[in-house]
Amino acid sequence: IYNNDFFPIDWPRVVLHFNHGGLVHTKGFKKVMKKRKPTMFVTHWDVCLSSESCFKVLTRRGLSIHFTIDNDGTIRQHLDINHIASHAGSKVNAKSIGVEVSSAYYTRYQNWYVKNGFGERPVIEGAKVHGSTLKPFLGFYPVQEEALKALMKAVHECTEIPLKTPLDKSGETSYNVSRTAAAAR
């Protein structure tokens, strides 16, 4: 939903906040009546066992998100994307659409996913961040990655957010949005 209008998402499992099983934020966001023009899509790794547990954590902290993607690939919309969710810092929130993708990250939770019928998550090994090699961690299910692609395409089509990866000054993929970049968008 964008400015109270439905937009299609080419995906079999979408739950809107007012549907059965939907979760809606009642605080922690800014309601916008005039149609806003978001310019970026911000994805977060929720480090929770499920979208529902992520939603509860955000709510307790007074934060909000537009979408979550659950373990089975279900896309849940929690806020009209016209509203400003509190998910990425004040300079970025007003210009962005936020999504949390569910994965507990730590390998000690692998058994929970198997026991609850989701199957084993991919284990990522050898990943580097800022020159340091991370310990093995749980990745996303392929169905979650496909759901994210479908969501990004749908949001792009209704908001015209470019489908481009942000680059830093050297032309490398940027995983953070700098203050300068946020101000320019």
Give residue ranges: language-model regions.
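Active-site-adjacent loop/helix surface patches within enzyme catalytic domains
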Residues: 2-162
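Surface-exposed patches in mature extracellular/periplasmic domains of secreted proteins
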Residues: 158-178, 182-185
